From Swiss-Prot:
PANTHER family: ABC TRANSPORTER ATP-BINDING PROTEIN_PERMEASE WHT-1, ABC TRANSPORTER G FAMILY MEMBER 28. NCBIfam families: 3a01204. It is found in: Membrane. Belongs to the ABC transporter superfamily. ABCG family. Eye pigment precursor importer (TC 3.A.1.204) subfamily. It comes from the Eukaryota. It comes from Caenorhabditis elegans. GO terms for cellular component: plasma membrane. ATP binds at G100, S101, S102, G103, A104, G105, K106, T107. Pfam families: ABC2_membrane (PF01061), ABC2_membrane_7 (PF19055), ABC_tran (PF00005). GO terms for biological process: regulatory ncRNA-mediated post-transcriptional gene silencing; transmembrane transport. Required for efficient RNA interference (RNAi). Plays a role in germline development. This is ABC transporter ATP-binding protein/permease wht-1. Residues 1-408, 473-497, 547-550, 666-671 are cytoplasmic. The keyword Nucleotide-binding applies. The lineage of its organism: Eukaryota, Metazoa, Ecdysozoa, Nematoda, Chromadorea.
Amino acid sequence: MHKAPISTLILDSLFSNMMLAEMMNDDQLELLKHQQTGIQPVVPEGCNLYWSSLNVTGPETKPTNFVDRFRNNMPKRRVKEILHNVSGMAESGKLLAILGSSGAGKTTLMNVLTSRNLTNLDVQGSILIDGRRANKWKIREMSAFVQQHDMFVGTMTAREHLQFMARLRMGDQYYSDHERQLRVEQVLTQMGLKKCADTVIGIPNQLKGLSCGEKKRLSFASEILTCPKILFCDEPTSGLDAFMAGHVVQALRSLADNGMTVIITIHQPSSHVYSLFNNVCLMACGRVIYLGPGDQAVPLFEKCGYPCPAYYNPADHLIRTLAVIDSDRATSMKTISKIRQGFLSTDLGQSVLAIGNANKLRAASFVTGSDTSEKTKTFFNQDYNASFWTQFLALFWRSWLTVIRDPNLLSVRLLQILITAFITGIVFFQTPVTPATIISINGIMFNHIRNMNFMLQFPNVPVITAELPIVLRENANGVYRTSAYFLAKNIAELPQYIILPILYNTIVYWMSGLYPNFWNYCFASLVTILITNVAISISYAVATIFANTDVAMTILPIFVVPIMAFGGFFITFDAIPSYFKWLSSLSYFKYGYEALAINEWDSIKVIPECFNSSMTAFALDSCPKNGHQVLESIDFSASHKIFDISILFGMFIGIRIIAYVALLIRSYNNT
């Protein structure tokens, strides 16, 4: 990456038409001031992108249920052809639109060109940039991809999001903080986001924020910060009205006119939007039916016997003509074949074929010294614009903002902890140490573990699964390392998982009348912190392994409830059947409960009422005289205090490592 003056990154014309349409806001005045400076838009020259003989196959059906995935006698799934011998090109300084009906293959073609979402697909063929074969790392280095669905961390403002992206995508090696900040402000102005720059992006049904149109513009702003040579857009007008859609495509056309290579897929463009395309690629049944200037497609269809009716949207006519009707599939296939043959018989069609064949030969014979390094680049050694430390700091900042701003992450949890702690403290208020209250005191300690587990563990799962798609997308875009994200998020969230357990323990410990010693209180706080963090580690692991909120929330209690049952409160260790004792060894409830019980009962040397002369001989024999006898009655040993703490700490670290490995595997599969 070579440093260029920040002025060369200015795209003054981008979204200027959109701004002029918003006459009632102050952003137009900012844009006019910006234009009056006389700075001309300078965009890095784009690339000529070629794809040759692309063939893509994939499974026709997925396993119908969980059992079918593991049945030995499951019939082999049939394979279907998704793309067949697809060749084409996207020229520098041109806007290419890929059109077709549902199932035509346009989304698959976009995925192949961007090297994304290709799991379970067999892809054959080659992609070249300016005549040189390009792997997925080269494509991602030179391009940006605006995906159909906007994904953001909703607790950040528009400006903060762009500052975050600029810090990671522009890097700290080539640009100073001042240059990055200047670029962010320029893009905010160009995108018409000045008036909402300090508005939070928003979380659906939780936190009100930007509108759909503003989020779409923010998506564009995120991707063009570094002015990529190639811009891919998947359904850029999705969710926008016709007026705004026209201005979005006009903005893309402006980018192309200034030298960028722009490729989009689009669904049912209006006639105005269609007129903005330099070239169109019409697809049907996984084949390219036409590739060339948009204004030459309608005459070709007319020549083949399918004229466009008067006053009819040409894009609708082209797509409807190439649509496959299941009730009359033979006629549809005949129409598609006739138009394709008509296109191939033209000079334009022959030139497309010739370019495809030439690039196929070039790709087959392409060997250079520089290509060797590209072939060895993998997910684990790819290059990033920002250093690990810069990535960590930026991700920590974003995660911290999420913690303090998300209503479900702090305020609700704090209120929940306070209410539960005070209710527990009132129920067990100043419980005395007597033979009759031994079970109550043990219940206080087990409640410590159970309450902190269920109050924080289960609500944390949907928070992680909601953020996971954002992380996977940003990671696939090469914005940051998986390790930097995981470390930053864990450290940013750790303070609340220290403060909340201490707060709960402080209220319950002193209100319920547990052993009144400061060091015993500190040890109980330590155990509560460890139990909480083991529980959170499990939520991390389950969420990253299963990724789906419903599945994760179903699996979690299946694991946690049996572990809790063998925690030592409901059944003693000696009473557990031998074939279930291993569950007790895995129970973090058991280690936490034992540590708290030792902390309480080991300090109690005498239980006075057990020396009452009025008690019967049988009652005296069964009455524990001190805390050690209480521990023996529940199969706990006072010598296990440090051992229990060590096991809990080991579980905390070990399960976090499992969660990280699961996230790493998921990130790898998503690249």
